[in-house]
């Protein structure tokens, strides 16, 4: 089940992305607590090998989040910093520039200061509640705009639609860190 306008968020939260439990035919999808999964042969899995990589419970969660957000896919991480780090390591390279909201989590600031800057990725800390300031911060080397709204702990708001328009105009990725907003198409 995916969001197509017919279902309320509460229905999607219960049934969205529903995965059939072929293991025990449970009505509510079970939580798999195993660390490792049986393999057909060494290095050949039946779908999952190790829970730190993937497992049926996480698959079901990702499908449910995708349904709630109205997108065909979602990826769940163990922590917000794991998600942010993966985003940047997968999308930027030496010489690239990133615009970062001036109210992001301190761990994100340290990620740039202690790791990404050392890899040659520059960043500009910008008051993203000031749309014109974001536009001025874009350079030919900019690849991503990272915002957090409402900002934590300031509660400063950024106009997601306005920043998304800047990102589209310059062919940039837009990442929105979310501490306070609910899931379920909170951006609509």
Write out the residue ranges for each language-model feature.
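Residues at alpha-helix termini
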Residues: 24, 68-69, 119, 170
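Conserved N-terminal alpha-helix of the aminotransferase class I/II PLP-enzyme fold
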Residues: 36-85, 107-114
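N-terminal "arm"/small-domain region of PLP-dependent enzymes with the aminotransferase-like
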Residues: 2-55, 61-64
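Generic N-terminal initiation segments characterized by hydrophobic and/or small/turn-forming residues
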Residues: 9-11, 58, 157, 169-170
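Conserved PLP-enzyme active-site core in the AAT-like
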Residues: 2-3, 74-187
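Residue-level detector of functional hotspots within protein domains
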Residues: 12, 17-19, 23, 60, ...
């Amino acid at each position: 089940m995916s969001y197509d306008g017919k279902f309320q968020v509460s229905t999607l939260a219960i049934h969205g992305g529903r995965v059939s439990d072929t293991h025990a035919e449970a009505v509510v999808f079970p939580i798999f607590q195993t660390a490792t999964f049986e393999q057909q042969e060494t290095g050949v899995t039946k779908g999952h090998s190790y829970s730190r990589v993937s497992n049926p419970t996480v698959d079901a969660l990702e499908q449910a989040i995708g349904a709630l957000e109205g997108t065909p896919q979602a990826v769940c991480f163990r922590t917000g910093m794991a998600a942010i780090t993966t985003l940047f390591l997968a999308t930027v390279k030496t010489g690239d520039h990133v615009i970062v909201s001036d109210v992001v989590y301190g761990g994100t600031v340290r990620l740039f200061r202690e790791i990404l800057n050392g890899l040659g990725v520059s960043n500009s800390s910008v008051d993203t509640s000031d749309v014109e300031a974001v536009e001025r911060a874009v350079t030919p080397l900019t690849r991503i705009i990272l915002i957090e709204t409402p900002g934590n702990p300031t509660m400063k708001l950024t106009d997601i639609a306005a920043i998304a328009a800047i990102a589209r105009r310059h062919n940039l990725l837009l990442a929105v860190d979310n501490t306070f907003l609910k899931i379920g198409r909170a951006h609509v």
